[in-house]
Curated annotation (Swiss-Prot):
This is Cytoplasmic tRNA 2-thiolation protein 1. One of its GO terms (molecular function) is tRNA binding. The lineage of its organism: Eukaryota, Fungi, Dikarya, Ascomycota, Saccharomycotina. Belongs to the TtcA family. CTU1/NCS6/ATPBD3 subfamily. SUPFAM superfamilies: Adenine nucleotide alpha hydrolases-like. Plays a central role in 2-thiolation of mcm(5)S(2)U at tRNA wobble positions of tRNA(Lys), tRNA(Glu) and tRNA(Gln). Directly binds tRNAs and probably acts by catalyzing adenylation of tRNAs, an intermediate required for 2-thiolation. It is unclear whether it acts as a sulfurtransferase that transfers sulfur from thiocarboxylated URM1 onto the uridine of tRNAs at wobble position. Prior mcm(5) tRNA modification by the elongator complex is required for 2-thiolation. May also be involved in protein urmylation.
């Protein structure tokens, strides 16, 4: 049937400049942030999935028959990761057994809603799910921690506790490989954060795609290391994936936000800056330090200022176990137990009146502001 040019039902003519730069057959719908390439929806799916597959194969992330836990939070990154890993596992026959592993930090109005998304993903993808909570592991929720120690320190606590919780959850499942949804933006932000803080020791390890602590049976990998956050969002949008998009209520206090803001400004000028920063981080290597001979136990070391120090053979190295909880630690007491000890001391000092009035809330706020942790 002929449709006259003036008829609104007539499809718009697609010019050569609007066609997909890969297939040259369909209209381009996506402009890739990574290289500004204009592609159609189907070609975008293909190149995005292929790039993730290439990252997995080039870095030899998985072994056939391996059981893998996806750190699932319900957010865009972990949701897309679970979807794509299941897809690629079936398409390329990786031979993996995939399990969803979620951590319940105990943040009312945030984590409870995101866990509802994870449970829907479990049904949608047909994957088993294991949920581990801070309350069960540490007898604290993040809301209780913030009430005791303040919002300024919230990400410090959560980072330490969450990392240990993932390892403990994997151990419960007898799984030795955890994959996380850290993307290229996250990796570049971590490099910037370590530079801004002058943390040279962590700078060298901040771009590793596969990590494993000495003595730990659990390794971690990041298949999205080179995937831009914007492309992950576009993939989730066009695939109509079910994910939770609300930011953690304590996230604005994190130092990472400073690095993220700097990254956005850089990306506006140079879109490739994210990958450039990652490659720069990969090229950084610490100069090897000359090894010192350790004096025998009980000997006296004379410092440069003339003072004396009695040498005691109490050094712990990576791969030792915490004396309290048995978790891997380079010290006698692991970081999590040290933080918990400080929280217990602070909790004893906080007196919360049984008052739901405005005056009671204000009094509690003033009490917490006086605490030093």
């Amino acid at each position: 049937m002929y449709i006259p040019p003036s008829d609104p039902r007539r499809p718009a003519k697609v010019t050569a400049g609007q066609l997909c730069e890969l297939c040259h057959a369909r209209k381009a719908l996506v402009k890739r942030p990574k290289n500004l390439q204009k592609v159609c929806k189907l070609c975008f799916f293909h190149v995005f999935e292929t790039e993730i597959h290439n990252t997995i194969m080039e870095n030899k992330l998985f072994q056939r028959g391996e059981r893998v836990a996806v750190g699932a939070s319900g957010g865009k990154d972990s949701t897309v990761l679970a979807y794509i890993l299941k897809l690629l596992n079936e398409r390329h026959d990786y031979g993996l057994e995939i399990v969803l592993l979620s951590i319940d930090e105990g943040i009312v109005g945030y984590r409870d809603d995101s866990l509802a998304t994870v449970k829907r993903n479990q049904e949608q993808y047909g994957l088993p799910l294991k949920i581990v909570s801070y309350k069960d592991l540490y007898d604290w929720t993040m809301d209780e921690i913030v009430a005791c120690a303040g919002m300024r320190n919230s990400c410090t606590y959560c980072g330490v506790f969450r990392r240990q919780a993932l390892d403990r959850g994997a151990a419960m499942l007898d799984i030795h490989h955890v994959v996380t949804g850290h993307n290229a933006d996250d990796m570049a932000e971590t490099v910037l954060m370590n530079i801004l803080r002058g943390d040279v020791a962590r700078l060298e390890k901040s771009t590793a795609i596969l990590t494993q602590s000495s003595g730990s049976p659990v390794k971690r990998s990041k298949p999205f290391k080179y995937a831009y956050q914007k492309e992950i969002v576009l993939y989730a949008h066009y695939k109509k994936l079910d994910y939770f998009s609300t930011e953690c209520s304590y996230a604005p206090e994190a130092f990472r936000g400073t690095a993220r803001e700097l990254m956005k400004n850089l990306e506006a000028v140079r879109p490739s800056c994210i990958i450039d920063i990652i490659h720069s981080g990969e090229a950084l290597r610490l100069r090897p330090r000359p090894k010192k001979r350790a004096p025998p136990p009980g000997s006296v070391e004379i410092r440069a200022d003339g003072s004396a120090s009695l040498f005691r053979n109490e050094g712990f190295v990576d791969g030792n176990r915490c004396e309290r909880c048995g978790y891997l630690s380079s010290n006698r007491i692991c970081k999590a137990c040290m933080l918990l000890e400080g929280l217990e001391k602070n909790r004893a000092r906080v007196q919360i009146a049984d008052d739901t009035s405005t005056e009671g809330a204000a009094r509690l706020t003033r009490t917490l502001e006086k605490l030093h942790f």
